[in-house]
Amino acid sequence: MQAQFQLLCFLVMIPMLFSVPWLAANRFSPQQVARNLAVAGLGIAAASVAWLLGGYSLAFHQEVISDPLPVLVQLEFALYALVMLLGTALAARRTLFFPLFAALWLLLVYVPVANLLWGNGWLAKLGALDFSGGLVVHLTAGLTSLVLVRHLRVQLPILTAEQPGTTALGTVLIFTGWFGFNLAPAGSFLPHGPLIMLNTVVAVLTAGLAWAVAAPGQELVDRLCNGINTGLVTSTALVGFVGPQTMAVTGLVAGLIAAQLVERYHQVWQDPVDSLQINTTGALVGVGGLILGFDPHLVPAGTTHLALAGSELTAVGVVVLITLVGSQVALWLSEGCLHAYQRIRGVNINVRSEEN
């Protein structure tokens, strides 16, 4: 039964995983859509190869061949972190940049963080909790978007207006897939599956309503879709550890804060999916909700608010450090490899020209 449950979660997440690149690619000019989708596909392929050849084993200390299904489920978590920062990476306008960066980022940032929190690493032993990726997936993605935006700021294009139908459809696919995203770490539907589903819906409703009220400068469809995405992101850190009342308050707070940040900084960052504001806000507010409102029956025995606050804040600090340093190193290495490739290619072209 556990294998069938994991398979169902894996299949449900597939449309969600590919809807984010679709939304990001369509925010650029129509002439760039095909290229952007191709770049996204290359990046997903490169990161998947890195995960299968060593990333999973390093993160979870298990061989890929021993039990392939968890490898694929965890791969989707890693890839979702990557596609959320895709919109920023597309601004580099170099086809080989994102595939190189994706593979390096997965090994230098995602794998160490996943090991520390989900692979029985030091932060997990310290008592830090992260149910379905508030820190592992969303905080790493949001902070990496910050690194990329700062590096690529002068190259960022003017984004095209969002199409309400495209945005709504993409959001529906993400919402549907998120049930698999939040349920997969539970391992089975019972006993906590119904609560996880309820908390996911509550987070979406409260964050969506908060966005609708707090961001009057945006179209209503955009506000609701952004609110849904914020609620989904916020739910991940605590969805299996709290009751619906705590989730409602957490979703409301996250929606209000994220709406203000996007309203104020969207034109500054020019990120098609507002990864920095939504992911970082959702992750940090989710951690705060977990510390203040966890249900003692849903967390490890003996957990106290003070102890959890210490372990969670330590985890946040460690994840921030690993992400900022690892992302910058991955960026430098990607740029260096591209520069070397261009020089070698230029030499080869000159040699062929002389021979002709």
Where are these regions (language model features)?
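Glycine- and aromatic-enriched membrane alpha-helices
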Residues: M1-N356
